[in-house]
């Protein structure tokens, strides 16, 4: 009988483009999502959880052009790959599932309920999304999105509300006023400016695309570089040539004037935009919407120190149909090359009035925002407000195996007082290993009670944080005056542990 071939052991590794999150990283994200969710909830938005898997047909953007979805999504076929099996895919954003839900339950009762979705429908959602794209530094195939959208509200009051809510979210997670700004623009205004500049009509679609990409590079290339891209084109430092939009110098002036129309306050900016869109109905409509948004925000106390009309915001204008907004953090950080740069964008959104049209054939107005959770966490780390460290539990050490019930009673007392605590459950034979474990867990306090201490009704409290500091740089006199280990009565255990934890916060 042939000897059965031994199967190789699986390799323990994370798939390419994915990563694991431990301890403090998970706690920090959970805390941030909770704070943002509280703001969304306060504004009257309801939470929604959808399946991680959608039909490729519902995703829309990745419909197969041959016999399977394109490579941008993680997709698989039902029924073992049979020809009539539906293609399914992991969601690539939170908007596609919202479109499906809004269409599916527009008139149909919600599961287990009698009513269908209200209109307008206000929802927020948080969770991972997946994109089958080439990974890179800081770019993963799974990441978190945190969205809020209003479906069925045509008024720009819904857009103004999203902007106000976005500002409140940033402050709720610890971004101070003055360190951020929410910038607002409108696709209709840009359409109007392009119309005035002779770029209307289907035959100018390619040129409009070049204009959009050009003005998005304003920060990097400056007005001169953008002007080149609006004209014949531009040669970069490497000698590569980028073809331009081919518009006249006079019309390029109009585009640049639009991008640079931001003035000292929102009213002055609106005035500049009115003159630039004169003669264009769509442009005039867009300026009027921006004026309404600024007025609605001012009535709620959101001035230009927090939210401004800024025509230089063009990212996403190719997708949105009306107002578009972007939250930018304005403080400086060091980039990977050691250069001082502004932190930049952490959230964006806008109005998209064709959300459920693919499903119903009818236009349904919608507006929303998506907050980049990982970017926002990185910003808080950059400002020192998050340290990437999570305080570990208090460790009750085990001096006598036969007294485990007493140690468990002790840890229960701590937990009942709201203190995170655990009993050491490894091999207690080597006490030094218990303290090493406590250090590795970043524990603030180790509790020690042998039979002698138990007989006297006391415990030893070892302040591990103070002990580490003293071991690092304390003089002999400081070490003697600040003992890292003290003896306290069992009756005072909770109060003394709370005092040590509070001292190191």
From Swiss-Prot:
Keywords carried by this UniProt record: Aminoacyl-tRNA synthetase, ATP-binding, Cytoplasm, Ligase, Nucleotide-binding, Protein biosynthesis
EC code(s) of this entry: 6.1.1.21
Enzyme class: ligase
Location of this chain's protein in the cell: Cytoplasm
Pfam families attached to this UniProt entry: HGTP_anticodon (PF03129), tRNA-synt_His (PF13393)
GO process terms (BP): histidyl-tRNA aminoacylation
GO cellular component: cytoplasm
Reaction(s) catalysed by this chain's protein: tRNA(His) + L-histidine + ATP = L-histidyl-tRNA(His) + AMP + diphosphate + H(+)
Primary location recorded for the protein, binned into one broad class: cytoplasm
Protein's UniProt keywords contain Transmembrane helix: no
GO terms for MF: ATP binding; histidine-tRNA ligase activity
Quaternary structure annotation from Swiss-Prot or TrEMBL: Homodimer.
UniProt record similarity statement: Belongs to the class-II aminoacyl-tRNA synthetase family.
Name of the protein in question: Histidine--tRNA ligase
Annotated organism of origin: Jannaschia sp. (strain CCS1)
This protein's encoding gene: hisS
